[in-house]
Structure formats: structure tokens, C-alpha cells
Curated annotation (Swiss-Prot):
Binding residues annotated for FMN, in chain numbering: S10, S16, H17, S18, M98, W99, N100, F101
MF (Gene Ontology): electron transfer activity; FMN binding; oxidoreductase activity, acting on NAD(P)H as acceptor; oxidoreductase activity, acting on NAD(P)H, quinone or similar compound as acceptor
Gene transcribed to yield this protein: azoR
Cofactor(s) required, per the database record: FMN
Co-factor binding comment: Binds 1 FMN per subunit.
SUPFAM superfamilies: Flavoproteins (SSF52218)
Protein task: Quinone reductase that provides resistance to thiol-specific stress caused by electrophilic quinones. Also exhibits azoreductase activity. Catalyzes the reductive cleavage of the azo bond in aromatic azo compounds to the corresponding amines.
Protein name, entry field: FMN-dependent NADH:quinone oxidoreductase
Subunit structure: Homodimer.
Source organism (scientific name): Nitratidesulfovibrio vulgaris (strain ATCC 29579 / DSM 644 / CCUG 34227 / NCIMB 8303 / VKM B-1760 / Hildenborough) (Desulfovibrio vulgaris)
Coiled coil spans: none
EC number(s) on file: 1.6.5.-, 1.7.1.17
Length: 209
């Protein structure tokens, strides 16, 4: 039995193109794998731990083996719980809209919490090494415009490029993608057609996940 962590990074609910496609993927996967478990983490609804002064100081002090204050202990323990919750999954699905050419701030906050030395990556004289390995991830991207590879517009895409880089940094090598674009620039008819195509693609991909 495998566990999927489904991370929703859009606050738009059913109106979200990225969530609609990811939902279709998860539904098709669950129908094909009824014994597996799907856990949903909506980063806009979740009570994510604050990564403020106490947590930041605790990160450095703990790395040096120095004692922590009670507040620092509590803040760092909350971070480690979030990391362990993330790492207990066997597979991952992410619904991700583009905001200002990048990713929503709540997902960035989530990554800032879980990407920690000794927990999700390590480093030595040879460089950095991801610690979250051997697990596939499916990302459903939605963008208002179109950013095709090999065009000048590709340089504006800090959504897909960032996510693939940060996931690769912590060890992911099997990163699969479904992209819905454009959801705004082409008008509503184009958006609906592109979403329908992406939903069908996601359903097919779910059978091999």
C-alpha cells in the first residue's frame, strides 16, 4: 500500500485549473489503486508552522550542537514534524498555478519550512545531496499565458523551472508534468479546451504512476 501526498497550492478550489486536473489524476489513480491512501495538504488552509526568528536561530544552533531555548525547541520541533509528514509519503501530486510568473507564496513558505539541512538535503565537499529519493511526483501546472520551450516567453517562466529545480535539489528525479496554458490569454473557450485536454492526459498518466 502506497501513500500519496496531494499538495494543493491554489486557493480557488473547484475554479482552479491546476486543481481540476490534479483532482482528475488522483481520482483515476485511486480507482486503479484502491488500496492506496491519498492525504491532502491544502497549503492555504493548513496551519503551517511559522519559520520566524526562533526557528531560524534554532536551525543554526542545532546544526552546531548548541543548546536551544524552550521557544527555539518548540519552533524547531514544529519544523521537523512538518518535514517528517512530508517525507512519509511514497508518491506526490502538486496542483500549482502560476502567480506573477512564479509560485504562490504559501507553497514557497511550505518549501522554506521543509527544505532543511540534514532533513531533506545534506552537503559535503562534493556538494549538495538530496535526501528525498526514489519517489515520483506529478505536477499539474496552470498558467494564464503560454510559455513554450524555445521561445522568448520561456524566460518568463519561474514557476515550472523553480519547482523542478527545488524538487531536484532535495532528491526528486522522477518529475512528471501536465500543463494547462493559456487559461486567460486565449479567452474562456481556449481555457476550457486546454483544461479538458490536460484532464484526459492526467487520467492516462495516472495509470502508470
Amino acid at each position: 500500500m502506497a501513500t500519496i501526498l496531494y499538495i494543493k497550492a491554489s486557493p480557488r478550489g473547484e475554479r482552479s485549473h491546476s486543481v481540476t486536473v490534479a483532482d482528475a489524476f488522483v481520482k483515476a489513480y485511486s480507482e486503479a489503486n484502491p488500496g492506496d491512501v491519498v492525504r491532502v495538504l491544502d497549503v492555504f488552509e493548513a496551519d503551517l508552522p511559522a519559520f520566524g526568528t526562533d526557528a531560524v536561530v534554532a536551525r543554526y544552533l542545532s546544526g552546531q550542537g548548541d543548546p536551544l531555548s524552550p521557544a527555539q525547541e518548540a519552533a524547531w520541533a514544529a519544523v521537523k514534524r512538518q518535514v517528517e509528514d512530508f517525507k512519509t509519503a511514497d508518491k506526490y501530486v502538486i496542483a500549482l498555478p502560476m502567480w506573477n510568473f512564479s509560485i504562490p507564496w504559501r507553497l514557497k513558505q511550505f518549501f522554506d519550512i521543509i527544505i532543511q539541512p540534514g532533513l531533506t538535503f545534506s552537503y559535503d565537499e562534493q556538494g549538495y545531496h538530496g535526501l528525498v529519493t526514489g519517489r515520483p511526483v506529478l505536477v499539474s501546472y496552470a498558467r494564464g499565458g503560454a510559455y513554450p520551450a524555445g521561445t522568448p516567453a520561456e524566460g518568463w517562466d519561474f514557476q515550472k523551472r523553480y519547482l523542478e529545480h527545488i524538487l531536484g535539489f532535495i532528491g526528486f528525479t522522477d518529475i512528471r508534468s501536465v500543463v494547462v496554458e493559456p487559461t486567460l490569454a486565449g479567452g474562456p473557450d481556449t481555457a476550457q479546451a486546454k483544461r479538458a485536454e490536460a484532464v484526459e492526459q492526467a487520467r492516462r498518466m495516472a495509470l502508470e504512476f
